[in-house]
Amino acid sequence: MERRHITLPLTKELARSLHAGDQVYLTGTIYTSRDAGHKRMCEALARGEQLPFDPTDATIYYVGPTPAKPGAVIGSAGPTTSGRMDAYAPTMMSVGARGMIGKGARLPEVVEAMKKYDGVYFGAIGGAGALLAKCIKKAELIAYEDLGAEALRKLYVEDMPLVVIIDCEGNNLYEQGREAYLKEHNKKEGK
């Protein structure tokens, strides 16, 4: 496990250099979307339409930020549960999106797509939306304004603190942690 400062876009080479458990400080452009936005984007792709942003090597943050206070770039911007996007994540990766930021476990189908398309799943700290918002230096609404907090935004972040939860080889920090706990627990119990 390493501590790394990385700059986007998340190229295939950069994605392959990351490992489950790595602590990263992310700088660059990311896009926001939640389930309603993902559904619209996947429907647009099914109709042969272009997405509101170029998905090539893109990183998508699963967030619905609160409104910005006067003088602030954005309001609280904590991660939402990633499982809500599991139905759409393989499609998004198939068109070039590579990074996903959220919280919680992912379905096996998403992990398989990550292995196929060199995707990386980053975990952000739930409950720390105000802290994460401080890393967001620019925010621009780019599509689906009618979705309110779930509208698509283009953000520029600096040193956003994340952890690689699942790397592009399918290594999963959640599973590794569970296995390490059980191994230690069984050792203590004499099993």
Question: What kind of feature is each model-predicted range?
Answer:
Residues 1-10:
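Short, structured beta-strand/loop micro-motifs enriched in basic residues and often containing a Trp
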Residues 10, 30, 65-67, 159, ...:
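A broadly conserved detector of short glycine/acidic/proline-rich loop/turn motifs that flank catalytic sites
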Residues 32-33, 37-160:
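Feature captures the catalytic cores and cofactor-binding loops of soluble hydro-lyases/lyases
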